[in-house]
Amino acid sequence: MSRVGKMPIALPSGAEATITAAQITVKGPLGSLTQSLNGLVNIENDNGTLNFKVANDSREANAMSGTLRALVNNMVNGVTKGFEKKLTLVGVGYRAAAQGDKLNLSLGFSHPVVHQMPQGVKVETPTQTEILIKGIDRQKVGQVAAEVRAYREPEPYKGKGVRYSDEVVVIKETKKK
């Protein structure tokens, strides 16, 4: 079994897991998430602790035990604490404004960019140059943040663009004559 798959997951208070043959559902104070299961990994709920066991000793089952354990751990963290990604706009005239489930971006194009948020993902703009993306599904939050960043990635000469708040953009030196 993989090292990650061997570690049990302790369910915090307020979170509960329902396991069927085809899927696992984790419910918490922020919502509920569902993950489909395959027959290679068995999950046991022992008084608020989730244990992962491989069905056979194949390499695929070992790999899936670690993957599934990581996915379920992200689900538990999501429904109890939630996930957030912070983006920063760097550049003259670059602005962001959240309007309901839409994010309006002015990124130096001839037109404003409007990004529709998927179900379960909320967006806030504390300032005009900061974007805060929140949700319970880690994959969706990261995907939306990557899509917003892709509209104008940080360029290497001035660093202008949309970047993650913890991202370090290495600035290149300009060509000398």
Curated annotation (Swiss-Prot):
Top-level division of the source organism's lineage: Bacteria
GO molecular function terms attached to this record: rRNA binding; structural constituent of ribosome
InterPro entries, A to Z: Ribosomal_uL6-like, Ribosomal_uL6-like_a/b-dom_sf, Ribosomal_uL6_a/b-dom, Ribosomal_uL6_bac-type, Ribosomal_uL6_CS
One GO cellular component term: cytosolic large ribosomal subunit
Keywords: Ribonucleoprotein, Ribosomal protein, RNA-binding, rRNA-binding
PROSITE patterns membership: RIBOSOMAL_L6_1 (PS00525)
Any Pfam family hit: Ribosomal_L6
A single GO BP: cytoplasmic translation
Function, in words: This protein binds to the 23S rRNA, and is important in its secondary structure. It is located near the subunit interface in the base of the L7/L12 stalk, and near the tRNA binding site of the peptidyltransferase center.
Assembly with partners or alone: Part of the 50S ribosomal subunit.
PANTHER family reported in the protein's UniProt record: 60S/50S RIBOSOMAL PROTEIN L6/L9, LARGE RIBOSOMAL SUBUNIT PROTEIN UL6M
Family affiliation: Belongs to the universal ribosomal protein uL6 family.
The protein's name: Large ribosomal subunit protein uL6
Primary gene name: rplF
